[in-house]
Amino acid sequence: MSDKRADGRLEGTSDTFGGLVIKKKKVEGDSKPTEPSGKSLLGLDRLASTKREHARKRLEDDDDRGVTESVRKGIEKVHEKHRDRDDRGMKYKSRDDDRRRDRDRSERREPSSRRGWKDRSGDQTPRFKVPDTPSRMSWDQDDREGSSRKRNSWDMPTPRGERDRKRYMDSERSISSAWRSERRNRDDEKRRRHRKPEDSVRSVKEEKAEPTFHDDEERAQWEEEQKNLDREWYDNEGAFDDEYNPFNKVSDEFVEKREKQWQEKTQKPRLTVKQQAIKRENELWENNRLHRSGVVAMADELSSIFEDETDENRVTILVQNIVPPFLDGRIVFTKQAQPIIPVVDTTCDMAVSAARGSVAVRKRREVEDRKKAQDKHWELAGSKLGNLMGVKEKKDETADPEDDDSGNYKESHQFASHMKDNEAVSDFAMEKSIKQQREYLPVFACRQKMMNVIRENNVVIIVGETGSGKTTQLAQYLLEDGFGDSGLIGCTQPRRVAAMSVARRVADEMGVDLGQDVGYAIRFEDCTSEKTIIKYMTDGILLRECLGDGSLDQYSAIIMDEAHERSLNTDVLFGLLREVIAKRADLKLIVTSATMDADKFADFFGGNCPTFTIPGRTFPVELFHARTPVEDYVDAAVKQAVTIHLGGMDGDILIFMPGQEDIECTCEMIKEKLGELDEAPPLAVLPIYSQLPSDLQAKIFQRAPGGMRKAIVATNIAETSLTVDGILFVIDPGFCKMKVYNPRIGMDALSIFPVSQASANQRTGRAGRTGPGQCYRLYTERQFKDELLKSTVPEIQRTNLANVVLLLKSLGVDDLLKFHFMDAPPQDNMLNSMYQLWTLGALDNTGQLTPMGRKMVEFPLDPTLSKMLIMSAEMGCSDEVLTIVSMLSVPAIFFRPKGREEEADAKKEKFQVPESDHLTFLNVYIQWRTHKYSAKWCADNYLHVKALKKVREVRAQLKEIMQDLKLPLISNGSEWDIVRKCICSAYFHNAARLKGIGEYVNVRTGIPCFLHPTSALFGMGFMPDYVVYHELIMTAKEYMQCVTAVDAIWLAELGPMFYSIKESKQSRKELKMESVRTVETMEAEMREAQKEMERRKEESDKAFKRPESSRRVVEVGSKSARSERRKLWGL
């Protein structure tokens, strides 16, 4: 039988079995062939079991981003194994083998007509070089061997350190380099090490040109546009303005277009669960067949190496919540869901109008954007035709070759050099002398009674309507009564302009020079001297003085003026002064208010405080309300102002507006309306807001040229303590901007809200200061009664309390929950602020201020930015971080004009650093500094030159504070990984991890976060696993703003209270025991701190009970130690 089978069978050349053979995985040292299974002739049962085994296995994505040294060693072992296998047996070797190999290599490098990669059957696409955009560049254009050309103009010099280059060579994208010859790798590495970074920025020696203009009208438009960004960051008190939302200028169409492109690039066809299972099984079957056939034998060995490396380098972040013992478990991690909105009803007419804004402002903004986007083809300077004709560019007067700190950033905010003698405008001021004007004020009639009350009581509440004279006269009465002999007479004002103007007026009434007997102290300016007796200042300045002198020994009397505004600093000062009054019986505290809420102030100071009311108003004011609700408050205010101006009555006009953009639009519309009329009388339109330069602010107090009428357009800065001579007409739209803390984004937001009834009455009183006036309210009488709050919500109840907590801790307040606030903030907000400061390292485990916290108090920044600056000095990158913090303190520096969005985006691509938006800001500033701070360079690259100038000023100010704190200014060169780690040290609490393609989630809260299309990380083709962001902007999605890629290890190192790394050796029990030991250690520290606090409290109580330390006898005419002048620096 066997012989018959042999006769009909063709014998093979070797003793191998035929048919489908499934080989087992080779075992080292075993060369025995695999025996076929006896159960199935073709081995189908084994194949089916193998298939089921693979089907049960779960595929894991290889997220490893780098090839480390261990992987390279594994690859080299594979190469050695294959070389050893090839050396076995007998081989034929020719002497001409090397020569032929060189010949073959040269043939491969030089494409011939017969062989190559190009398709000969079709037409070749011509290649056009467009060197302006990186998307149209060849990827290796600047790195080709033997190329002597300069880098392209788009490739800005983004510094890269040796660490970055090495990390890229070890990444998955360079795995093919492992298969090159050793000589090729050595040569490439040598070229990389000795390659010098070339600066692709054009030389700026020739480029010192100012934008040319066709006529004077165009120059005026350009100058007007530059004013729009003037003083945007001063005095906004760290608030986020909706007008300067970094994503506000980005159109919805652009966002949808970029996101659609990204989805089309990354979106996969949707499959059902059954289809996915079938597809997965087919892939496993194909891979198995390829592996068995020997085609991809090495891929299996390499994949095993990568799997081992993935398991080795994969970092798992564990989220935890450690609560310090001083909070006693009272922390609430879910912050307040909705911000406190200071309106009666969010659906009322005025609230809806405030949220919608002005239509006239929106239309004018669009027109300005179109003008800005207009390409000026008539300009010949710098063009090819202009070069042929010899037209040269004008010298750029804005270019500044000096260093960052060469200019005096304080000059533009100092009022003393711009203040002139006030000239009388109204008949009342021109006909009466200063003495007669003082005696005409209502406060003069009750002067003696008021001073008797002040002498008999330490705390007095004085209520007087606007214009009664309490601000200017009260300090002079105290001086005349002898209070200036034993110390200073201080008077606080809520705003800088108010402090400056009142000091100017009091100096004129006393007949002394400003800065001598009467002076003022505001931010960036201290206009006082050794002779100063009456000192006007902002409430923030007095709060800062409490840091150095908790008892305020240099003051004999303090006047808290305009206390009804209830600013944040005012409420904190009330709590501190209450403690000071209890310790000092010789200190007089006078609280003045223009509203009838004196009982609240009296109850706060013990209930025994007398209340003195100044009767009467200076001049009557006629009140007019709108008949119907107004749709556009800007357009209505402009029409009313033109109507008043064209009427027969004399007197200046005061118009209230919410913000800077509304003010600028109102001024321009008034000028346009009057320009359309024939023979219209002249009108001087003057804006005033806190961001305006001091020289322009001072113009409102001066007489208009030619005696023409003035129309002053102001924010609520003109509500209190600001007397402009000649104001007889007031136009009140009924809106203002207020800071409201939004816990979701973690910062304050400046938004437009309806004013309160008390503020409306204050605005009405502005018309009756120097004569009978009229007030036009652009809202109905019903809206005044039903849609306006009785009084303004205190700022302390609607703002971020982190800076307040930090300041109170620096003042020695141990238990903040027991601190005396007139209107205590929500306890949850206070506890959350304390918890945030503890996570930043400003508070220790016992709730006391740390050395880092004391340094953070000195910076007028958010605590997070202060932490970043302090950590940068320790990490050796303070110069770079100082620039980044300064860039974050100003509005958006990029702009996208309509019609030229793509060109602006292409320019922006030059500056983007793929790992970080923060580093992109740093790169922009470095390039601007390289171009000698040129304004033309900013215009060419679609950058706001005014915003960058403010960055220089902020940087100089912060640098001065760092020098005072002995923090070194160090630059780390091109090692920007250290900068990213420093950013992570401050924003680790805003960390997000990758969830899907283009989608992140907050590591702690799970809130979805998305990259905005304008981010440098959007669409770069590589999504980092972890990022930190500056803030969340709530628009169509929860977009992250200012994103930086970080490593997971950094989060665990810099934020141990939130994150920890899971180690394979640690069990769950060991992790729990470790957390218990941490809590026990903190509780032991808290017990020791409580004992120390009790001991200090007992000592302070004993010292307070001693009569010799609590009372002092002061002789009349003697100088006290409190009169010693201390050097003061502003906020």
From Swiss-Prot:
<dbReference type="Pfam" id="PF00270">
    <property type="entry name" value="DEAD"/>
</dbReference>
<feature type="domain" description="Helicase ATP-binding">
    <location>
        <begin position="451"/>
        <end position="614"/>
    </location>
</feature>
<dbReference type="InterPro" id="IPR002464">
    <property type="entry name" value="DNA/RNA_helicase_DEAH_CS"/>
</dbReference>
<dbReference type="InterPro" id="IPR027417">
    <property type="entry name" value="P-loop_NTPase"/>
</dbReference>
<keyword id="KW-0217">Developmental protein</keyword>
<feature type="binding site">
    <location>
        <begin position="464"/>
        <end position="471"/>
    </location>
    <ligand>
        <name>ATP</name>
    </ligand>
</feature>
<dbReference type="GO" id="GO:0000398">
    <property type="term" value="P:mRNA splicing, via spliceosome"/>
</dbReference>
<dbReference type="InterPro" id="IPR007502">
    <property type="entry name" value="Helicase-assoc_dom"/>
</dbReference>
<feature type="compositionally biased region" description="Basic and acidic residues">
    <location>
        <begin position="1"/>
        <end position="12"/>
    </location>
</feature>
<feature type="compositionally biased region" description="Basic and acidic residues">
    <location>
        <begin position="407"/>
        <end position="416"/>
    </location>
</feature>
<feature type="region of interest" description="Disordered">
    <location>
        <begin position="1085"/>
        <end position="1131"/>
    </location>
</feature>
<dbReference type="Pfam" id="PF07717">
    <property type="entry name" value="OB_NTP_bind"/>
</dbReference>
<dbReference type="InterPro" id="IPR014001">
    <property type="entry name" value="Helicase_ATP-bd"/>
</dbReference>
<feature type="compositionally biased region" description="Basic and acidic residues">
    <location>
        <begin position="139"/>
        <end position="148"/>
    </location>
</feature>
<feature type="compositionally biased region" description="Basic and acidic residues">
    <location>
        <begin position="1085"/>
        <end position="1114"/>
    </location>
</feature>
<dbReference type="Pfam" id="PF00271">
    <property type="entry name" value="Helicase_C"/>
</dbReference>
<protein>
    <recommendedName>
        <fullName>Probable pre-mRNA-splicing factor ATP-dependent RNA helicase mog-1</fullName>
        <ecNumber>3.6.4.13</ecNumber>
    </recommendedName>
</protein>
<feature type="region of interest" description="Disordered">
    <location>
        <begin position="1"/>
        <end position="225"/>
    </location>
</feature>
<dbReference type="GO" id="GO:0040022">
    <property type="term" value="P:feminization of hermaphroditic germ-line"/>
</dbReference>
<feature type="short sequence motif" description="DEAH box">
    <location>
        <begin position="561"/>
        <end position="564"/>
    </location>
</feature>
<keyword id="KW-0067">ATP-binding</keyword>
<feature type="compositionally biased region" description="Basic and acidic residues">
    <location>
        <begin position="180"/>
        <end position="225"/>
    </location>
</feature>
<comment type="function">
    <text>Probable ATP-binding RNA helicase involved in pre-mRNA splicing.</text>
</comment>
<keyword id="KW-0539">Nucleus</keyword>
<dbReference type="GO" id="GO:0016887">
    <property type="term" value="F:ATP hydrolysis activity"/>
</dbReference>
<feature type="region of interest" description="Disordered">
    <location>
        <begin position="389"/>
        <end position="416"/>
    </location>
</feature>
<dbReference type="InterPro" id="IPR011545">
    <property type="entry name" value="DEAD/DEAH_box_helicase_dom"/>
</dbReference>
<feature type="compositionally biased region" description="Basic and acidic residues">
    <location>
        <begin position="65"/>
        <end position="122"/>
    </location>
</feature>
<dbReference type="Pfam" id="PF04408">
    <property type="entry name" value="HA2_N"/>
</dbReference>
<feature type="compositionally biased region" description="Basic and acidic residues">
    <location>
        <begin position="160"/>
        <end position="173"/>
    </location>
</feature>
<feature type="domain" description="Helicase C-terminal">
    <location>
        <begin position="629"/>
        <end position="812"/>
    </location>
</feature>
<comment type="similarity">
    <text>Belongs to the DEAD box helicase family. DEAH subfamily. PRP16 sub-subfamily.</text>
</comment>
<dbReference type="GO" id="GO:0005681">
    <property type="term" value="C:spliceosomal complex"/>
</dbReference>
<dbReference type="GO" id="GO:0003723">
    <property type="term" value="F:RNA binding"/>
</dbReference>
<keyword id="KW-0507">mRNA processing</keyword>
<keyword id="KW-0547">Nucleotide-binding</keyword>
<keyword id="KW-0347">Helicase</keyword>
<dbReference type="Pfam" id="PF21010">
    <property type="entry name" value="HA2_C"/>
</dbReference>
<feature type="compositionally biased region" description="Basic and acidic residues">
    <location>
        <begin position="1121"/>
        <end position="1131"/>
    </location>
</feature>
<dbReference type="GO" id="GO:0005524">
    <property type="term" value="F:ATP binding"/>
</dbReference>
<dbReference type="InterPro" id="IPR001650">
    <property type="entry name" value="Helicase_C-like"/>
</dbReference>
<keyword id="KW-0378">Hydrolase</keyword>
